[in-house]
Every structure is written in C-alpha cells, then in structure tokens.
Amino acid sequence: MSKKRKRQDDFQKTKLKVGKKKPKADNATNVNFRSKSIHLPEQLKHGESGPTTHRHLDIKDLLSQLHHFNSNVKQGALVGLRELLSANPTMVELHASVVLSEVAALFTDKDGSVRAAAVRLLRFVAQCIPSERVAPFFPLLSAHLTCAMTHISEAIQEEALRVLDVLLEHYPGLLSQRHTVLLGNFLELISQRRKSGTGQDKSGKGSYALTVTTNRSVTAQQWRLTVLLRLSNFLQAVVEERPLEEGVSSRIGLGMWAVEKGLVTPVDVTWEEHVNGQGKIQLFENSGAGPTSHSAYRLRPDSKSGAGMDKELCSAETVQGFAATLVPLLLEIWVEAAGGGRVQTDSGHLLSAESMALMFQILSILQLLRRMTPQRDQQDVLDAWFRNSYLTDFKQHFMKNFPYGLLEVARHKKKADGKRIKQPVAAGVVAGSTVEPLAVNVTLCQVMVTLSLRGQDHVAAEDADWLGPIRVFIRETLSNGSKLSSKHLAALLEVVWRMIVTQRSRVVTDELLQAVYVQYQQRNLSVNVRSLLLRFFSQLYIQEHQNHPHIARSRILARWLASLPVQLVQLGSRNPQLSAQLLETVQPAAARGNKDLLQSLQKNACSLYDPQEGCVVVLPVESQKRLVQILHFLPEFPAELLACLSEVCNTGRVSASLATTLIRTVHLRSPLSGCSSASQDVPLKDVDYLSFFFTTLTGFSSDMLRALQDKDEDDLLAASTLSPLSVYTTSLDQFLHHWDVVEVVCHCLDTLGSRAQCFDVIQNAIINNLAGLVVVPDCVCVALLRCVPRLLDVNFLPSDTLLHFLSDCCLSMLSLLLQLEQSARKRDAVWEACFAALSSVPRLLRLVLQSFRVLDLCEDELPVLAQILSLLLQHTQLRNHMMANASFLQHIIQDLTHYYGGESREQWLIDLLYCYSVTLSTHRANMGIRDIY
C-alpha cells in the first residue's frame, strides 16, 4: 500500500449503523454527577456585635443590602429593618439619619414592591420620631419626594402620593414649609406648560394644559381626583400650620365668625400677684395697631421655588399668581367631567359619585386658596380678585344646576378576577368618592358667598340671581327637621353669618336666623351641635350688635336672648360647659341693658339663685362668678330673691370671697349706699336691704333657728350657770366661712349714713328675733359680739334687753373658748369677738362679772370660772375695765378664797390669785404715777 493511501486511512470516518450508539472517545469526560446551589439565609456569626433580626442580620448588613441590584434582596432588607427597629425602639432615633436617607432614595426605585416596602417602613419610622427630630433631615425627604412626584414613570408618581400621605399625617408642619416646591409638583402631575407662541394663553385657559396618559391603571378623571384630594389635604396643612397673626380670622370651628372682631390684644393679669406693687403691668400692647414683630433670622437659606411658584404664598399677589394657574385647570377638569355626565343623564343637577367627589375637591381647593392670605385686608383683596376674574365662570359651571344630588346607578355583579390588583392604585379615589351631596352643596355656598361684596346695594341686586338659590337652600336645609353633623352645621352657619353681614337686610336676617333658630330648638342634639349653635348666636350678638343695626333689631335674636335664662335653669349642672357658654352671652347682654333678656332674667332669678339647686351653687367657680356679676344689672331685688341670696351666702356652697362679692353687689344696688343711680326706679327697698343684711349676719334663717330649739341635747353644749345658752357648735369650715361673711356685713353696715338709726334697727331685730332663743349657734353669738361694737354709736345707749342677751352670749362663748383646743383659728375668732364686745360695749363687762355667782356654782364649775377670770385679767387692754369693776372682782375672788379656805389650794386658784395681784399692783402703780403728776 502506498504512503498516500495510508494517509487517507488516517482521516477516514467510521460509518455508524442505524440503531447503534456512537462509541465514546478515549478522552471523554464522565458527567454522571449532580450539582446543588448553596443558599445562606443568615450570617454565620459567633459573636454578637448588636441587635439583629431573626436572620442574624444587623443594621449595617441591612443598610448595605438596600444597594443590592436584586429587588427581592432590597425588599427583604426593608422588611428586616422594620423588624429590627420595631424590636429595638431606641435604634430608631439613633439611626434616623441613615435610615431616612436610604429609604428616601428608594422612592424612585423601579420595582413596585420595593417602593411599597419603603413606604411601609417610612410610616413606621414616622410613628416613632417626632417632628423636631426629623426636621434636620426633612429637606432630603422633600427632595426625594419631589423627584418621585416629577418622575417620568406613572407608577412612581402614584407611589409618591402615598409618601405624601405619610408625611401629611405625621409631619404636616414640616411639609407645609416646602409648599413653594410641592405646589408646582402637583400642577405637573395633571398638566403641562403650554407651548409659547401658540396663542392659547390669550383664550383665558391659563399657562398650563391638562394632560391625558393612557398608561395608568386608572382613568384620567380618577387620577385627577386622586391628585386633587392630596392637593386639598396639603393646602389644608399649609393653612393650619401657618402661625396666626393679628387680623386673621380664627381657623378653629367657624373661621368667618371672628372676622369683624377688633384687633385689641388682651393682656391677662392676676391682680393677686400685684398687691404689693412689686411688678409692672403693661396694660396695652400697641392696642393691636402694630403687628407683632417676628425674627427674620434663618438657620438655612430659603429653598428654591418650584414650577409655577416664585415666592411663598404670603400675600394676596402671590396667591393670585398661583390661583391664576390652578383655577383654570380646575374649571377645565370640571367641564370635562360634567360633559361626560350629561351624556348619561338629562338632569344636570344629578351627579355620579365620582363627579360628586371631584366637585367637592375642587370647591375645597378654591376655599383653601382664599384662606392662604395671612391678613384680613388681603383676604378682601383676594375675594375681589376672585369675583372679577371667575364669578361668571363659577355661575356658569357651578351655580347653574345648584343644588346637586346623587345619581344612583344600578351596579351589576361582576366575577372576581385579577382587578383586585388595581385596588391599591385607586385607594385615593375610593377615599375621595365617599362625599355626601350636602357636603358639596354647603361647600359651594361657602365659596360663592365670599364673592359677594358687602355694603354695596347695586352689587347685591346683581347677585340676587345666584344668592337667592343659596338662601333658599340654607333655609330649607336648616328648617326641614333633620339633624346635621357638626361639620356641616358649622359650614352652614358660616354662610349664614356672611350673608347676614354682607346683605344688611332685616328681612334676610330674620329669614336666615329663623331657620337657624328652628335647628336650635330641636331636642336631643349632640353636645357639639348645641355648643356650635350657642356660639353662633352669642358671637353674632356680641360682635355685630353695635356695627349692624339690622342685627340688633332682629326679632329672632331678641327671642333667643329671652330664652337663655330659662335654658340655664333647665340645664343646670347637667352640662357645665354649655351653661358656661350661656353665661358668656347673658352677662354682656345684661351689661348692655337688653330689655328682653333682663325681663326673663328677673322672672327666673329665684330659680337661678336657689340655695339648694340653683345654678349659683351647682356650677363651677367661674360660672358662679358670672352669676354674681350679673346681679349688678338685675332690675329689681324682691324679698324672695334676697332671701335666696342670703341663704346662698350662709350655706357655704360658694366660697367666702364670692359671698363677699355678692354682699357688696347688693349693698351697692341699694340707695342707702349712696352709689346707686339717680333713676326713679329703686331696685332695692330699704326694709328688704336691712332684712337681707340681718339674715346674712345671723347666718341662719328664722325657720332654721326655730328648728334648732327642738334639737336633741346630745348635739348641743348644755346650758349652765357659766353658759346661760345652749350652744350649737358648727363645723370649722362653716364657722370660718360665716366669720368672713360677718366682716363684710359689718363693713357695709358701717358705711351707711346714720349709724344710730342703723344700730337701732339691728338692736330691735336682735331683741325681736334672737333674744328669746334658748339654743343659739356659736357662729351667731360670735357674729353679734363682733357686729354690735362696730355699729354702736358713742351717743347711743343700748337697751338692757340687748345687753343681757349679749352678756349671755359672751359668757357662753367664754365657756366654749376653754373647750376649743384643736382649732386655733376658731379659738382666735371667738376671743377676738368677746374682747371687742367687752371692751367697747358699755356695762357689758359689769353684767358679765355680776353673773359670776360663786355660791350658785358647783365644784366642777369653779375651775372654769377661775380660768375665765384669769383670761380676762391677763389681757392688757382689759385690765383698766376690770379695775373699773374692782368691787365685783374682789367679791368674786373673796368667795373663791373663802370656799377653799384651807392650807391646800388648787393650782387654778393659785394662778387666779397671782393674776389678780399682778393686775392690782400694776393698777396701783399707774394710779401713783398719775397722783405724782
């Protein structure tokens, strides 16, 4: 075989037969094995460096995984961070900076599950950290939120609104400070800037045009509703978090009600703190004429303005600039939505649930735009601008079919399918769709009445075509007997207030107030609703009474004022807050001399000041003070009312200071005080005046004193030779309360013109009503011993009957004084009264000494007599009076010494003899000195 043929054999292929396997090559690799992946769910760590998750991952590992390329790893890291921080709350604030920065960076992540987990973690962190701790990191959060809201991806824009919800819920104040940027972002979510040079700006549609995106999971109208709902919430936060300045209407409750209020800044002063004159009081703070100074210092430069916003919304001009961009978009949105609704129904006033929610958000935004201005005068400028710019559009698009109702659409049952996935995306739409027609109609009324200018008759005539339906709607809504919620009622009352003030018509005023009064007269209203109606009528009368005569002459308002005392009697202590609100109106109305109120107040005075169940004793202290102050304006004080007031002062159910104020008020209303007015009507008769003061002086009425005479002896200090009267001991609180009352009674009686006549009246009253009593309360005895010396005239001699009764009272109180060991204040008061009477009333001390008959005393009473005499002798100012009756004193001591004539004497007798010898020697020394000179 040739060499050439051999070479061909080397490259010749082996032909395989069908069904035979190819033989393996000599260098073939055996692949008969299986491989498995190694999965490490947790770190293999032996030493614990800090808190970890159940997978043994610490916070550094979790934060590092947030930068992983795999979405599942990032989502697991976010879940792990929430687990770690919830198990260790102290780590939240410790790692707040890095956690917030990393979470904020994931707002724009391309994976939806990662963004959702980031929002859940942000919500958890926001619940744990207060706003002051987040403030340093909030610019970063706001920047990432802006990136998400302006992102090209529709899904990221939708997730950005959920981030906005979290920040609005937990940090509204911080978020509202970034409104210059975020408001422009809202515009870009639903619109885009028109191209310049196309001529579209001249058509009045604004510089922005609505956009329609087909890539979203919801319709364009649903997306706009979602954005407008967040925009409304954001504007609400901006308005509420803005610091309240002078002249701005109150944002709590009914913002319109405080519009006409003066700009005087009140200064609260507690006079008790300035009794000694050590502190200075600034009575006026510019009287409201100058604005409060605010510091212009900033920790960081202001943020750059966003799209559509060049300056902060702090003036009418800046708000107008933003409104000029936003309002045309809102009108265009509503025209588009309303056009689609008319295709389905011929009734333009019936709206679908989605259109109803859309209109409500549009109207809410319009209302909030007006409240963006910080001062009252700028609000008027903004209202005028809205009227000139958009009144025609509002009447055409909003008022044409007013009022609106809900269109009921039959819903067919659909099979459950994968559409549930769209539920989270349209969550904002669902939240904004639950709007009642009443809320939409009321909000529309609020927006429209702000466009009516006040004080211009020709303007009012021009506005009658759209103000008339509003007035009819309000009247029917308030008068149909349905119970309204506090939110809807507050909005309706705001509209009523505005229409009453602007139209200045007595017919319109009575018509609207009659509707409100019908709502007010309903029974079983909630406390919030009742309080709201009370505040409306009260502020309408107090603030607008003098500025608007048509309000002052309203018959409905007069009828409401006349019903207040009756309501106060019926309400009582069942609701102290509502009673306090009633009194806040009754007092200024009484001060202004409202005849209807004063007549009703006079008619129900005895019920209001009833000592058992009246408002003056069952309400809190502040309300009690108002009731006492109202007495100053009461037309008359009949005897029945004075009896109630006297018992109120004596029962102790009001404080001593308040009882003092009440007594002084009655005193000033009497002609005897010399301070009453020169009018012919006498509010208080002299007889009733003196009867009131005598009853208050005694502390017990005649019926109560009569009942004490039949009281069991176990509750009394029995009468004896040294205590001629049976004493009824009162409690310490009652005694001290009555002591303070006695002081002011004595002061008032002491200021009367003729003291002799006053004392004669009091003397006859004591003799006729008290002298024949056997059982006398201790406070009554002390009151008489305190009052008689102060009222006794030098040239007037008291009667023997009065002196003997005072002697019995003094003896009984001296005996009681020795038994008062625990109460020092009561003992001091008793001794002060006894000393004043013994040292000032002529012959009283002699009668007391004459009643000390040693031979008639038992052995147990002798020490008591000795202690009384020692007490009288030890007092320096009584020594001269005692020595003036030295013969009686010497006779008593001789009888005591004769009774104990033995060598052994009791200690009480030794003390008495010592006091007597000291007093006698001192008196003789003084007499010797006078003889020398």
Swiss-Prot record:
It is found in: Nucleus, Nucleoplasm; Nucleus, Nucleolus. Keywords: Nucleus. The keyword Ribosomal protein does not apply. Pfam families: Ipi1_N (PF12333). Gene3D superfamilies: Leucine-rich Repeat Variant. It comes from the Eukaryota. InterPro entries: ARM-like, ARM-type_fold, Ipi1_N. Component of some MLL1/MLL complex. Component of the PELP1 complex, composed of at least pelp1, tex10 and wdr18. The complex interacts with pre-60S ribosome particles. Component of the PELP1 complex involved in the nucleolar steps of 28S rRNA maturation and the subsequent nucleoplasmic transit of the pre-60S ribosomal subunit. Belongs to the IPI1/TEX10 family. This is Testis-expressed protein 10 homolog. It comes from Danio rerio (Zebrafish).
